[in-house]
Amino acid sequence: MKLQALIDFMETICPPALAEEWDNVGLLLGSRSARVEKVLTCLTVDRAVVDEAIATEADCVVSHHPFPYHSGKKWTTDTTEGTLLLKLAGAHIAVYSPHTAHDSALFGINRQLAEGLGLVDVKPLYEGKLKATRAMLDGLDESDALFFENDLKGDGATLGTGRIGRFEQPRTLAALVAQVKDMLQIDRALVVGSDEKRVSTVAIGCGAADEFIDEAARKGADAILMGEARFHACEEARARNVGVVLAGHYATERFSSAILAERIARKFPELSVKPSVKESDPIRIV
């Protein structure tokens, strides 16, 4: 099949209109008319992923983070990014990134985190970016179409950034932390707030999302799950009595690569689609 068919599907489930204005999303390397048989999904394109893509003879890498992250004027071997881009281009491997469009999509990463925690009444933290329409159902398989149909019937009809929902049974912040660690399979998390703090309403922002703290507090969140945040943002959260769970940028997004690979494979059974098994978190807590 042509790469354009994969692009069309990605832009249906992760509409580019949902991406932040500063973001570099879409097809970032390659030809839309190129043939695609093997796809590799990952969080970030690095040396290990590039070598894996070449070794597995992938035709396209679908990377959550853009690569290149910023549009540039020159790509040379003077930089790591330039070296890897040239290596991918030499192997005729395309790169596509949905990034913040995937964060905010109806089935996207923030939604997946909310479902993993068992939150109910889940809505975007910031609403009003784009109204979901029946046209978004075009090109989806039956199960994906049903998912969108169900969303269109309720409050989820409004797409937006971040998520906020509530537990049917409130719990302590310590219990939320334990749940997050189990869900994301991590040993440690950074926490703002007392273990005994009562948590009912939870906001979510995968990756770097400390700008969500103000809106989370305004909407009555007792806690917010994020990947990472600056020190002063954590001070602000403490001052406003919002508990914070920092589970790591990698951990709050990497799990979704396997989910995305499964969705692409279900839509295009003729493709070989696999999540990377070589990438790893560059940060270790010792």
Predicted regions and their residues:
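Hydrophobic structural segments
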Residues: 1-286
